[in-house]
Amino acid sequence: MSGSTLFSIGEALIDMIPSRVGCSFDEVPSFSPRTGGAPANVCAAFARLGGKSAFLSQLGDDPFGHKIARELEACGIDLSHLAFTDKANTALAFVSLEEDGSRTFSFYRKPSADLLYSPEQIDPAWFADAFALHYCSVSLVDSPMRYAHLCLLYTSPSPRDRQKSR
């Protein structure tokens, strides 16, 4: 890969951030929704630094999914490979924050929309301008998303292939 776009595949979710630090989940009075998910965060950070990034995933066709899409688009991320589905909801992660900064997560994603993203939704031609593919291990569970990752790894053009074709 020697193009100019960072591609990231995997989860985008809503982190439910507690209004109070240092207490257990059952003691938290309220939570605030924030866009999260490591692959989405990597795209956002790279775009904010002036890079070109594209996000591949699937969100629920629900208010949280549309909130995530609006916020990622506002960062300047290419969302042309983002899908929506009514077959599952957008993933949620409730976060507990300790005084020392450590975190505990409780995930709601059985299955979530991102895990249903499948190889059939990917066109290898998208990656002609890719310089890197980022992904995280969370999406490698036995799901259609796992096979979408494998599809990318086996079909994305490598720098050696590009040099041979010149």
Each model region followed by its residue ranges:
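Conserved small/polar residues in nucleotide/adenosyl-binding loops
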Residues: 154-159
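Charged helix-capping and loop-helix junction motifs
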Residues: 147-151
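Glycine-rich phosphate/adenosyl-contacting loop at the front of the ribokinase-like
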Residues: 1-78, 117-119
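Flexible, glycine- and charge-enriched loops at secondary-structure boundaries
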Residues: 32, 142, 146
